[in-house]
Amino acid sequence: MLEVARLHKLNGDSALKAFADVVISGQMLVKGVRVVEGKDGLFVSMPQNQGKDGKWHEIVSLLDDELKQALQEAVLEAFNA
């Protein structure tokens, strides 16, 4: 169902640790998924754009909780491999 097509780890002390491209059901490619180090550990963030209001808005939103969880697990597993 999910495949991490590409994962690019970043060096340095930034909270941003990696970018990933994820294929969903062999039909959709989501580029720019991010792995971020937060205060509670690593988490996965969907691609975002900054609006004219200065706020960040997701470009792609996963509506199914199981799909969100599967995407997070797949990306973090690829990051930790």
Q: Residue spans of the language-model regions?
A:
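Single-stranded nucleic acid-binding surfaces, predominantly the OB-fold ssDNA-binding core
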Residues: 1-81
